[in-house]
Amino acid sequence: DVEPNFADTLPLIEETANPRSVGVMENTVQSLIDADELYGRSINFRGGQRALLRYGLENTRVYLPGMGPAVGAEAASSVYGAFLDTQLATTNPISLNNVGAYLSQSKEMGYTYGTMQADNGESAEGFEASYMRLWRFNRSGEWRIAVEVLSPF
C-alpha cells in the first residue's frame, strides 16, 4: 500500500507560481501549446537531456517503459536523454504532433498530449511514441514540465 505524503509535493508547489499573480491569470491554452511545441523543437536542437534540463522543473518526473519514475532534474533528464538516444540511434529530427491541451481553472497548471516520431524520410520504420506532459507555470513566468510520460508504439 502506498500512502500519500504531502511533504513529497511541497518542493513542486514551491516552484509553482501563485495562481493569483498577474502572469498566471494571463495564461491561455494556446500559451501552453506554444510551450509544448517549443519543447519539441528544443529536443531537436539541444537533444532530449538538455531540452528537459531547460524546460523541466527541479522536481520533474519522467516515466518511461520498463522502469520506475526518474525524479529530479538531473536524473530525469539523464534517463530521458539516454532513452531518446537509444530509440532514435540517428540524427533524424523528431516531429511533434500536439493532439490536445487542457489548462486548469487556476491557470497555473495544465497538460498536453500527442505523438512524436522520428522523421525517417521514405522509411516507414522508426521511433513513434505517444506523450503526455503535465506543465506547471513557475515563479519566473515560464511553463515548465512537472511530469513527462512517453509510451512508444
State where each predicted segment sits.
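Short, structured motif recognition centered on aromatic/hydrophobic residues
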Residues: 1, 39-40, 95-96, 109-113, ...
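Short, low-complexity N-terminal intrinsically disordered segments enriched in polar/charged residues
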Residues: 2-54
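Short beta-strand edge/turn micro-motifs at domain boundaries
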Residues: 1-17, 128-153
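Short, conserved clusters of charged catalytic residues that mark active-site
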Residues: 34-35, 95-96, 130
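Short glycine/acidic-enriched loop and turn motifs that connect beta-strands
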Residues: 117-120
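A solvent-exposed, acidic/Ser-Thr-rich amphipathic alpha-helical stretch
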Residues: 49-102, 106, 113, 123-126
